[in-house]
């Protein structure tokens, strides 16, 4: 006589919100790096930062200052950008509008959700 055991394993994708939160945490903790002479090593520009692991988020160039007008673009730096007026974080209007003030606008739109009850 014999017995048979069936074992099934699977991994579930985290929610989109959880992925976004994890990515934001990594973004906030990211470090600027330069390439090592061996072509495979990443060296943090700040000597107080530990070398990154394969799972760390790093960058090699600073982002442009979006608060300064860009002569290559026709419009001013941040005009027409949506923001969150109540947030003091990265998506907040005070930060995105570079402290220059902003105009609040309420937009109401109707969407056909194709709901069934």
Curated annotation (Swiss-Prot):
Disulfide bonds join 83-98. The keyword Secreted applies. One of its GO terms (biological process) is neuron differentiation. It comes from the Eukaryota. Keywords: Developmental protein, Disulfide bond, Extracellular matrix, Glycoprotein, Lipoprotein, Secreted, Wnt signaling pathway. A lipid is attached at residue 1 (O-palmitoleoyl serine). Glycans are attached at residue 84. SMART domains: WNT1 (SM00097). Its main location: secreted. Ligand for members of the frizzled family of seven transmembrane receptors. Probable developmental protein. May be a signaling molecule which affects the development of discrete regions of tissues. Is likely to signal over only few cell diameters. Belongs to the Wnt family. This is Protein Wnt-6. The gene is WNT-6.
């Amino acid at each position: 006589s014999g017995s048979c055991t069936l074992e099934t394993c699977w991994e579930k994708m985290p929610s989109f919100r959880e992925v976004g939160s994890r990515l934001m945490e990594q973004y906030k903790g990211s470090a600027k790096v330069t390439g090592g002479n061996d072509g495979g090593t990443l060296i943090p520009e700040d000597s107080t930062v530990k070398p990154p692991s394969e799972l760390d988020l790093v960058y090699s160039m600073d982002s442009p200052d979006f608060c300064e007008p860009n002569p290559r673009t026709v419009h001013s730096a941040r005009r027409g950008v949506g923001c969150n007026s109540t947030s003091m974080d990265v998506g907040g209007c005070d930060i995105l509008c570079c402290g220059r003030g902003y105009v609040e606008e309420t937009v109401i739109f109707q969407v056909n959700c194709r709901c069934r009850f």
